[in-house]
């Protein structure tokens, strides 16, 4: 940094006591810091508001050189710290001339200077500090940081052998080179490294000083310099109002100043700053403020207004009255005491101050009495209510415990008076509740009586049409009563002669009856199942680290993030609606109560005279005297404007109002309205909020369907699984007629013998040595299928010598990996092959056992193993431990024993494990048809609108069906199992090439169709493309190609296409109706009931099914059903967990897999056109992403300025239905605007204002943890 200065202080050489010449510094100015400035640089000064800096040099480059003196962090108050460095002058103001007029204030100035150990006598001429004064000042000064020296050799002068070192940054000479200690430099961000913090580091900080404990406003006081700036503002404002002769404003400013001084006193006590210097200064400060307040009030009361106006307008201070001069002198002393207090508090200025104003705890904002499901609950078994996480950490930290939640805090620290739930009913429980509670035990509403509806209801209401019907039915019941009440109010307004107390009491009674009927609606709003939105927030968190078994690519993450940003506003409006519902109901009750009062203003004295937030700190931008306004009057005027109603006043009330004004009576700004008119307006608001609740419930249901519809149509079963995880009813799968209607995971042991009676009776008639050993551990279902059993029982039934259950065998071999490892499964089979005979058998019984059981079982074992290796073997089943089984030796032993099929078994074993041809031996793992790619024939791409329109829709649909059916035939059962199991049972499955290729093709087709439309700038051509693709989708339906049909529909209902209203208007209505019929077929409501019915009607016809339904069924069946059944013994009530395999779950999976395989058997009898197929394949590559397409959509048809655009993630007609519903219920643009902007109050000119603090809370509840 350059040292060139416009003007600089003089450097006068002086000699010390030893006679050496050392330059002496001369300050040229004294400045006061007005704005905070922090820096990490060692050659710059960090400034706080109120600091005094002695300027040594004013550089031309905009930086000044100065010295800053502060108290040190030691307990000795006389110990000082000297800092020298560069600082920006724009953060300071010169006070050199102001210090001349400081009034006499007794010994405070001498005490202040004595504390500095300096003798500063500032005059009009610059003061030259002698070497002795400078050394005396710096003798006991401790440097805050080790200074960085840059020594520069000086040329030797004649007659002088002394070598001086010069620091260019600080412009200081020295004789010796100070070597810096090799200590690790701590970062400036660590507050513990500051001396300001070290002074109170050993003290126990208050709980409320935690930085992350509350939701804070921007204007909240956090550090000392914030408080100093706020107090100084009110001091200046009070002085200005005094000199301006504005009595009301002066009293308001003085009241606010007194409140801030009270906060200062409370902070000193909370921080335990009990030094004598603090106590004396605070007492003098309060005394001076009291004296100033008394004298100012005497001034305003004893002096007439005109005289005060004349005296205050005098510019010459000497011509003012002695009383005013005395008041101003007292105020100057108050100024000095504040500066002295700031100087004393400098060592603590980086301390986070305790919070004194009321604020919400973080993670605990529950929107008044409503439940907030987005709040992460940290429940403890000893506590009935969840507590704010930050409050738990603060209380635990104050108790010497490091804990993140309630579970890590001992019960003794949580304020619980009992060790178990039953202790509440003990005789000593009442006495325990009388003890002094802690912060945990005194949580409002912690009793059972004050629990919300949420805690009383076990199951939440699902987001479906049934819940919406409940709300609508209840609203219709309330509407009839409400219309009658409005009719009664209208009759009174038309004829006041019918006024009577009985009528008012009757309306009041009907109001309570009406409100009590609202409880079911409140119950539904309080207990809506918002699990899918909770999961969406968790998945949309950028900082979330997903488990290994969760496969989410970049495209999925972008979709989740986009959906979260779109739905956050809807959820925020939903919570605002719930709060508004609460406000309307309360107002409805209060207005009804007013009808029964003779004097409707009897409760007016209970109203607080001060507006809400009167003592709230002001924003930094408002701390300007030029822009400062009267806080009290301004707030009241704002409230009056916001709360101004459109009620028509009663004529009689107006006459009374004017009479009171003429009599100069105090009417306290009361408004005289017709109460019946007010009651009618409240009924209208109540009626509107009921309708609004239906709209929001319907909106949440539609958005939920949109999310699931997108995931299903894009075949993203992993997204569907993650979104629905934890939702009530998740995992329920209706597999058709074969599925059990009432299937529970708990099975009674005395009921598993009721099915399959005939076969079991035959088993009972057999000799004991021929009966199955584990037959009692099998659980049968109502459809004569094995529902569950132990591992031994399942293996025994698999290798049974009498009954061959083909479906059971297939299910077992397909899903065995979810029950056993490969080594364990084959070990069980080998053990079954080597059965031990029962004890106490005679020779004849033994021979019968060998002939009728052992040999048949051995044959069954060999047959099962051969079938397994030949048809159901997958390379991912290979394990290192399989070598220990010696399967080739086992097969050779079976050959020597002449077991049927043993030779073929040996062949399969050698082929799988010795020749290493596992990939070729697995017939299911067949690659895609590569003939087209091998010929390297490149056709013309469908890259233009003309080329796409030139292809006949029938030809396009035919070739598209052939291509997609070929890809569908490459899907194997292992692809499907890998898609749902992932790494759940084994990490060696690998990818699912066939299924991934099929899903990728469908998604590419969707992107190709949407991109082909949005890239076309001409509206008429876009309309032709829309009609063209609709016709292609219709022909795909005729060919039973539901996969391509769904991909086309998804593209046409995507956000970038659906919003093109002008383009859709150019499509003829018949074509749009055709698209709606296709979309109705693939409607996801009721688990794609229309599509499933259409699919069941197909018998032997070829078909390309929509695979998203299968993925959903597989995902729900696997994730929604447990792997094990719990056996409940009816007599003993004993639970034996994880013993009985839930085989019914595996059977359902195989049912779905069989349907997938079924449609691979029948092929289309179409002629393949390789040119068209090649063009289709090549056109699907390198398509821009959905975000790019949406940008193109905005270019061809920009958003209307005053119209709400649909959500970008709407992929079906549910949004169109939402628009229709809103149109039917609204019919007017006024109501639509009120709904979108949330301007709900009919009786007010403005919408209910949501504070900035509440908006910040909503942002926390719906964003990343």
From Swiss-Prot:
An example Gene Ontology CC term for this record: plasma membrane
Keyword field contains Cell division: yes
TM annotation in the entry: none
Biased composition (Basic and acidic residues): 1214-1236
Keywords in alphabetical order: Cell cycle, Cell division, Guanine-nucleotide releasing factor, SH3 domain
Domain SH3: 26-97
SUPFAM superfamilies per UniProt: Ras GEF, SH3-domain
Region (Disordered): 409-454, 623-648, 1201-1252
One of the record's GO molecular function terms: guanyl-nucleotide exchange factor activity
Residues annotated as domain N-terminal Ras-GEF: 782-914
CDD domains: RasGEF, REM, SH3_Sdc25
Biased composition (Basic residues): 1239-1252
Residue stretches making up the Ras-GEF domain: 952-1199
GO biological process: cell division; Ras protein signal transduction
Keyword Kinase: no
Comp. bias intervals (Low complexity): 416-428
Note from the entry: Suppresses the CDC25-5 mutation in yeast (restores cAMP level) and has similar functions as CDC25.
Name of the molecule in the record: Guanine nucleotide exchange factor SDC25
């Amino acid at each position: 940094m350059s040292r060139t200065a416009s003007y600089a202080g003089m450097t006068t050489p002086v000699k010390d006591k030893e006679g050496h010449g050392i330059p002496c510094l001369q300050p040229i100015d004294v400045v006061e810091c007005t704005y905070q400035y922090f820096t990490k640089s060692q050659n710059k000064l960090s400034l706080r508001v109120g600091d005094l800096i002695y300027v040594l040099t004013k550089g031309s480059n905009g930086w000044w050189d100065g010295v800053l003196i502060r108290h040190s962090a030691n307990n000795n108050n006389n110990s000082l710290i000297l800092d020298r460095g560069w600082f920006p002058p724009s953060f300071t103001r010169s006070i050199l001339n102001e210090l001349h007029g400081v009034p006499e204030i007794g010994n405070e100035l001498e005490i202040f200077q004595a504390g500095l150990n300096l003798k500063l006598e500032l005059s009009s001429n610059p003061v030259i500090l002698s070497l002795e004064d400078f050394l005396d000042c710096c003798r006991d000064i401790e440097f805050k940081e080790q200074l960085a020296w840059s020594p520069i050799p000086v040329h030797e002068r004649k007659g002088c052998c002394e070598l001086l070192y010069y620091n260019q940054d600080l412009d200081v000479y020295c004789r010796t080179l100070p070597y810096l200690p090799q200590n690790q430099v701590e970062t400036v961000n660590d507050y513990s490294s500051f001396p300001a913090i070290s002074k109170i580091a050993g003290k126990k900080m208050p709980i409320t000083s935690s930085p992350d404990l509350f939701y804070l406003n921007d204007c909240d006081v956090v550090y000392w310099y914030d408080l100093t700036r706020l107090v100084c503002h009110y001091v200046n404002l009070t002085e200005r109002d005094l000199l301006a002769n504005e009595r009301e404003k002066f009293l308001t400013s003085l009241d606010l100043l007194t409140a801030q001084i009270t906060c200062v006193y409370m902070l000193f006590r909370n921080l335990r700053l009990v030094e004598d210097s603090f106590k004396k200064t605070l007492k003098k400060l309060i005394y001076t403020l009291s004296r100033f307040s008394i004298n100012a009030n005497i001034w305003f009361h004893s002096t007439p207004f005109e005289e005060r106006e004349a005296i205050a307008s005098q510019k010459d201070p000497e011509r003012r009255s002695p009383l005013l001069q005395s008041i101003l002198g007292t105020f100057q002393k108050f100024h000095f005491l504040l500066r002295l207090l700031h100087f004393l508090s400098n060592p603590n200025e980086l301390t986070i101050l305790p919070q004194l104003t009321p604020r919400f705890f973080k993670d605990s904002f529950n929107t008044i009495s409503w439940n907030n499901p987005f709040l992460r609950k940290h429940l403890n078994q000893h506590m009935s209510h969840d507590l704010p996480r930050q409050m738990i950490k603060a209380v635990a930290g104050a108790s010497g415990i490091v804990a993140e939640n309630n579970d890590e805090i001992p019960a003794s620290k949580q304020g619980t008076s009992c060790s178990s739930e039953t202790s509440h009913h003990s005789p000593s429980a009442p006495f325990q509740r009388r003890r002094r509670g802690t912060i945990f035990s005194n949580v409002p509403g912690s009793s059972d009586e004050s629990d919300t509806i949420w805690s009383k209801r076990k199951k939440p209401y699902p987001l479906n049409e049934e819940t919406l019907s409940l709300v609508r039915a209840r609203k219709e019941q309330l509407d009839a009563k409400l219309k009658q009440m409005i009719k009664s109010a209208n009759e009174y307004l038309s004829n006041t002669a019918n006024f009577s107390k009985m009528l008012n009491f009757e309306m009041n009674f009907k109001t309570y009856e009406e409100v009590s009927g609202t409880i079911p609606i409140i119950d539904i709003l309080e207990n809506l199942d918002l699990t899918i939105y909770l999961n969406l927030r968790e998945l949309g968190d950028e900082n979330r680290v997903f488990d290994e078994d969760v496969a989410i690519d970049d495209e999925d993450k972008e979709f989740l993030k986009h959906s979260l940003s779109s739905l956050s506003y809807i959820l925020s409006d939903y919570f605002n609606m719930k709060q508004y519902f609460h406000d309307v109901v309360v107002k409805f009750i209060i207005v009804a109560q007013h009808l029964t009062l003779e004097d409707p203003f009897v409760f007016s004295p209970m109203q607080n005279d001060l507006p809400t937030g009167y003592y709230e700190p002001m924003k930094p931008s408002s701390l300007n005297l030029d822009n400062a306004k009267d806080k009290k009057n301004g707030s009241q005027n704002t409230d009056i404007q916001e709360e101004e109603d459109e009620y028509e006043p009663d004529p009689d009330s107006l006459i009374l109002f004017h009479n009171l004004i003429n009599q100069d009576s105090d009417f306290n700004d009361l408004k005289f309205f017709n109460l019946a008119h007010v009651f009618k307006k409240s009924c209208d608001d109540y009626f509107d909020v009921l309708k609004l609740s239906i709209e929001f419930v319907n909106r949440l249901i539609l958005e939920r369907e949109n999310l699931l519809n997108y995931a299903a149509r894009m075949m993203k079963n992993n997204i569907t699984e993650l979104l629905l995880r934890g939702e009530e009813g998740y995992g329920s799968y209706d597999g058709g007629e074969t599925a059990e209607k009432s299937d529970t995971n708990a099975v009674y042991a005395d009921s598993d013998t009721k099915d399959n009676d005939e076969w079991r009776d035959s088993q009972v008639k057999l000799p004991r040595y021929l009966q199955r050993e584990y037959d009692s551990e099998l659980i049968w279902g109502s459809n004569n299928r094995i529902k569950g059993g132990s591992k031994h029982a399942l293996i025994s039934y698999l290798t049974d010598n009498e009954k061959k259950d083909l479906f059971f065998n297939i299910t077992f071999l397909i899903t065995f990996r979810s029950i056993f490892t490969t080594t364990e499964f084959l070990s069980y089979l080998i053990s079954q092959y080597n059965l031990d005979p029962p004890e106490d058998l005679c020779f004849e019984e033994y021979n019968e056992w060998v002939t009728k059981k052992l040999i048949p079982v051995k044959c069954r074992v060999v047959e099962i193993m051969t079938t397994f290796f030949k048809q159901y073997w997958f390379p991912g089943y290979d394990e290192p431990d399989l070598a220990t089984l010696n399967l080739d030796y086992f097969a050779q032993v079976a050959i020597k024993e002449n077991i049927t099929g043993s030779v073929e078994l040996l062949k399969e074993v050698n082929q799988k494990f010795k020749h290493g041809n596992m990939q070729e031996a697995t017939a299911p793992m067949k690659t895609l048809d590569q003939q087209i790619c091998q010929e390297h024939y490149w056709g013309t791409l469908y890259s233009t609108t003309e080329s796409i329109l030139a292809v006949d829709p029938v030809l396009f649909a035919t070739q598209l069906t052939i291509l997609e059916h070929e890809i569908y035939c490459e899907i194997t059962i292992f692809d499907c199992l890998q898609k749902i199991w992932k790494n759940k049972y084994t990490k060696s499955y690998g990818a699912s090439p066939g299924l991934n290729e099929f899903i990728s093709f469908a998604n590419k087709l969707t992107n190709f169709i949407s991109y082909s439309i949005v890239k076309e700038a001409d509206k008429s051509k876009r309309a032709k493309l829309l009609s063209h693709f609709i016709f292609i989708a219709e022909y795909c339906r005729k060919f039973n190609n539901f996969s391509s049909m769904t991909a086309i529909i998804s593209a046409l209902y995507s956000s970038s296409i659906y919003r093109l209203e002008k383009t859709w208007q150019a499509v003829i209505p018949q074509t749009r109706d055709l698209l709606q019929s296709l979309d109705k077929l693939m409607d996801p409501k009721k688990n794609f009931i229309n599509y499933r019915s259409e699919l069941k009607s197909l018998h032997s016809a070829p078909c390309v099914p929509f695979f998203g339904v299968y993925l959903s069924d597989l995902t729900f069946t696997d994730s929604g059903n447990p792997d094990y059944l719990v056996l409940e013994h009816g007599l003993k009530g004993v639970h034996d967990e994880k013993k009985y395999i839930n085989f019914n779950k595996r059977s359902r999976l195989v049912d779905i897999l069989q349907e997938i395989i079924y449609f691979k058997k029948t092929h289309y009898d179409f002629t393949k056109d390789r040119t068209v197929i090649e063009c289709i394949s090549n056109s699907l590559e390198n398509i821009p992403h959905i975000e790019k397409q949406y940008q193109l959509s905005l270019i061809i048809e920009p958003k209307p300025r005053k119209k709400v655009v649909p959500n970008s993630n709407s992929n079906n007609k549910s949004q169109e239905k939402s628009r229709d519903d809103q149109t039917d219920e609204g019919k007017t643009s006024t109501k639509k605007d009120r709904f979108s902007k949330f301007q709900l109050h009919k009786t007010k000119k403005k919408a209910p204002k949501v504070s900035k603090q509440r908006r910040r809370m909503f942002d926390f509840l719906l964003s990343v943890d």
